[in-house]
Amino acid sequence: MARWCAAQGWAVHPLAPGSKLPPANCRRCARPSAERPNPQYIEHETADCQCIEAGGHCHGVRAATKDPDRIDRWWSAEPRFGVGIACGASGLVILDVDDHAGADRPADDDYLPGVQLPEGATAEAFRSGWDTIAALCEVRCAPLPWMDPPTLTVLTAGGGLQAWFRVEDPELWHPAAGRLGWQLDLRAGRSYGIAPGTVTSSGTYRALGDCRTVAPLPSWLEEDLRRTGHHRKPEPKGKRPSARQLLATLRPPKGDAYVESVVRAEVDQVASAASGTRNQTLYSAARALGRFIPAGQLSESEVTACLMAAGTAAGLSDTETRA
């Protein structure tokens, strides 16, 4: 199944036998905790992981690949691995319809946030995500999204469903749980779906029907997903100035040459940080510059803008920099 998925253009990664989760990282990559100390751990950024570069599958979805040789090595070593599908790297979003008995119920107007329920519908009519998606389709006068056009749809081991869709801009979609509706989740970006045939302790994931191709995301559903914040607008090119441009225009109040010199030094260190040290360097810079905010020597927006630009120059994503 992993080779077949890769042949469709989807990036795959292993799931631990009998589980929906990736296998544990190697000792070098397993971050320690108070409960689980690990003296063999080496601080590094996932994007620079030597294990992934060498063909390993540490860090789960971040190791996803379409390389048939690497896939053969992984599943030859452990044929019981399940198959995870990296959404963003595969150009996919996956609508996850849950069937969780006993799940907490929201307020009546939060079963479908921002949508007026069908006439006569009450909270008692909602027993699972199946009822939620049916109600949304009724309001939109649309068929179930995996039916027209048909798309690869997987019945989960827990009684739910995952409907797979193609998108043109996968990097702009991000996952969220319950934002579209009660027991409706979206898998996108660095989240993953589970391929049919994967066996977990709860049962086997199975394809629904005969369709094995993935259809484009229906336009009506795309509109609702955008409305509920699953899609971000692309940042116009050139909108964010580079670290060098920011440094050229930054003028701390009162002509404080010392503050300016510290800002320049810290931003330069972040922008030129070597792989494996970027997160720590960014953290140190944030602490160093943050001390000027209470005194009014720098504004929070100035510090944030400089660090975001420096992080970009260092090769960090916006998410990594904000973290």
Regions found by a protein language model. Give the residues of each.
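Conserved phosphate/metal-binding and DNA-contacting active-site motifs used
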Residues: 1-239
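Modules that initiate DNA replication and primer synthesis
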Residues: 6, 160, 167, 199, ...
